[in-house]
Amino acid sequence: MTPILAAEALTYAFPGGVKALDDLSLAVPQGESLAILGPNGAGKSTLLLHLNGTLRPQSGRVLLGGTATGHSRKDLTDWRRRVGLVLQDADDQLFAATVFEDVSFGPLNLGLSEAEARARVEEALAALSISDLRDRPTHMLSGGQKRRVAIAGAVAMRPEVLLLDEPTAGLDLAGTEQLLTLLHGLRAAGMTLVFSTHDVELAAALADRVALFRTGRVLAEGAAAAVLSDRATLAQGGLRPPLVIDLALSRARSRPFGPRSALPRTRDALAAQMAGWTRR
């Protein structure tokens, strides 16, 4: 099946010659959740900015639905309608006076009628469980609320792919769990998710697939359980397996565990397997 979004041999260097992306290729399967995992400075955010057309590669190309993208005004408008982006700092994304006005901006700029734009906004606010915030001034929102409003603004465009840069940055535990529930809901509704993170626990909880980055290159890419259980490769990126996978791997040293695909990736899955261990 043709990937919904793909990067082919992307290279991009900042002024001074430091390469953020170094001949990087990556495919995003439709309907899946892909984690772009790696330490700070690995090129994760730079890739996302290429995947929605904000940055133009110095070499290589981005394909959307198998077709090479262009950077004309018309091409970019269509591209950003199909591929939404939520920035790491929601304050960089919110600019209207109220939540409703902010979420309305994208649909209105698509040329939709006021009635259709309003319907999309109401739908997005409901999907993100923030309908009660519709008239709230954006500067009076909490960090978690701002993040959800920024996501609602992208969702209101009805994109095929949603890109999220460090989606849980700055959120407390409760805010992170609420956001995970919302993102799982978008994923279950068929939206393709691509998110950058340095948090292996988040990658385990949300991703179907993981691409491990280091200095603008892909070190490893594959099913989440396989990549997140590969200690040696994770160490090259300055990371280690998530706690739930680490505990399961430790158990497997004394008793065969089974295929890596069966490794638990959430606390609930680990608890269920631990209950099975005590019965054996």
Swiss-Prot record:
Record domain ABC transporter: where: 5-240
UniProt-annotated binding residues for ATP: 38-45
Membrane topology summary: Peripheral membrane protein
GO biological process, one term: cobalt ion transport
Primary enzyme class: translocase
SUPFAM superfamilies per record: P-loop containing nucleoside triphosphate hydrolases
Pathway connected to this protein: Cofactor biosynthesis; adenosylcobalamin biosynthesis
Assigned keywords, A-Z: ATP-binding, Cell inner membrane, Cell membrane, Cobalamin biosynthesis, Cobalt, Cobalt transport, Ion transport, Membrane, Nucleotide-binding, Translocase, Transport
PANTHER family the UniProt entry points to: ENERGY-COUPLING FACTOR TRANSPORTER ATP-BINDING PROTEIN ECFA1 (PTHR43553:SF24), HEAVY METAL TRANSPORTER (PTHR43553)
Similarity comment text for this entry: Belongs to the ABC transporter superfamily.
Reported function: Part of the energy-coupling factor (ECF) transporter complex CbiMNOQ involved in cobalt import. The complex confers cobalt uptake upon expression in E.coli; can also transport nickel with a very low affinity. Presumably responsible for energy coupling to the transport system.
Stated name of the protein: Cobalt import ATP-binding protein CbiO
Organism field: Rhodobacter capsulatus (strain ATCC BAA-309 / NBRC 16581 / SB1003)
Encoding gene (name): cbiO
